[in-house]
Amino acid sequence: MTESQQLVNKLWNYCNILRDDGLSYGDYVEQLTYLLFLKMDDERTKEPYNHKSDIPKKYNWQTLLDREGSELEAQYIETLQELGKEEGIIGVIFRKAQNKIQDPAKLRRLIVELINKENWLSLEADVKGDAYEGLLEKNAADVKGGAG
């Protein structure tokens, strides 16, 4: 199994857990996109990149890692809302963003066990692209299979 396939399977397995709570594939990919953006921004601020983040410190990746339960859920909701008000590309990415993950324990698991365990910037661009494409393909196949 390739690195891309392993990553798609990990992402997909977690998606199935969230689907039990009524989260659609589209919603999952959307939430994953927001969280991955925050995680990759955090990675860019560290060695060997050392870039300055455009995300205000009170809404960065670490603020999500530092919280659990209802505090995590509240922080995530506030982060999405406030980043949507930012100028430039940050505001565009997060405009009208909403939390769709209703279970704070599952949100924490997604953040800590899935997203935070990977160093996303070190992955080849093809791996990230393949993973995203794989999720979209699985989504399309599932929607097509369920449309009967």
Indicate residue ranges for each PLM-predicted region.
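Non-catalytic, mostly N-terminal accessory regions of nucleic-acid modification and defense proteins
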Residues: 1-148
